[in-house]
Amino acid sequence: MSIIDPVNKSKVPQEWINKSNIPGDELEEGIMSGMLVVLSDGSILKRGYTTGTTATVAAKAAVLSLKKEIDHVSVPTPVGLRAHMDVKAKDGHAVAVKLNNDHESDITRGLEFVARAVESDKITITAGEGIGIVTRGGLQSKKGYPAINPRPMQQIMEAVVEAVEEIGIKGASVEISLPRGAEIAKQTLNGRIGVEGGISILGTTGFVEPWNDHLGEMKSDLIRDAAKVVLTTGRIGIRYSTMLFPDYTVVLAGSRISEFMESATGKVAICGLPGLVLKWGDPDMLKDSGFATVSEMIEVEPQGEHIRRAFEKTVEKGKGARIVVVDRDGTVLMDSGEQE
């Protein structure tokens, strides 16, 4: 028996749950709320809420406070769960603080989001100070507009609709701002990608995963200093590598596995999806196979000769590294095991 994580849709095996020190009912409630992530050794990591969810909390609370003082709200998230946060809101002015989480590099933890609301004949959402402005094309928000991505903007709108219906008004004009947004933005890549003057309001799920998906930027130094390191190939690989190897440093290597292996001084594991890991080990694995993709090959012939040979070549190329291949649900398809 396993539980399905409602945020990333991965399976949480019962054996992982059994290893945890948290009582079963309490742990299951935490998992199903989206806030807790269980690792393979039973340890727990805590998710936080995105900038999008925090902005949503502030916006809804500001509208509700037009009628009465508010100290707690529930808002929708893009994955269908409700987010619950404390907030201070009175007379159309709300302050929500972005929750702490176990993502060590989340520089927006503890940041205050401010929303101001006035009654109106329709719903409008505007961005104030501290929210960046898009200065070039190619991003999810249009050039010249505030850097509020479509998913969180929809999330904010849905929450404000809930609020105006709850207090019985026709609409509200809501302005969202971050007093320290411009300051924090200097620590991000926003300036390089074309967002100026503040941070971006982001979040495809509404939740912040408790691991870093940009560790590859730290390159060789991080790997060299790690006693145990997992090299992985993408964001899905990061998720499952963190769960499967809780006492390892997880590094996003992408297509640079070979380069990063040379920097490692301790134990090394390579973990990721078959189309990335196996093709690193055997770039020609699809040649004369009759398959267009590795995913197709895995689905049709999971124990086939081409898969077996590619895994053997990957293990050989790994030079003693443990090779773990997972599918998109986190199921381990192949594992070379601990190397002596």
Swiss-Prot record:
GO terms for molecular function: cobalt-precorrin-5B C1-methyltransferase activity. The keyword Nucleus does not apply. InterPro entries: CbiD (IPR002748), CbiD_sf (IPR036074). It comes from Methanococcoides burtonii (strain DSM 6242 / NBRC 107633 / OCM 468 / ACE-M). Coiled coil: none annotated. The keyword S-adenosyl-L-methionine applies. It comes from the Archaea. This is Cobalt-precorrin-5B C(1)-methyltransferase. Its EC number is 2.1.1.195. It catalyses: Co-precorrin-5B + S-adenosyl-L-methionine = Co-precorrin-6A + S-adenosyl-L-homocysteine. Pathway: Cofactor biosynthesis; adenosylcobalamin biosynthesis; cob(II)yrinate a,c-diamide from sirohydrochlorin (anaerobic route): step 6/10. It is an enzyme of class 2 (transferase). Belongs to the CbiD family. One of its GO terms (biological process) is methylation. Keywords: Cobalamin biosynthesis, Methyltransferase, S-adenosyl-L-methionine, Transferase.
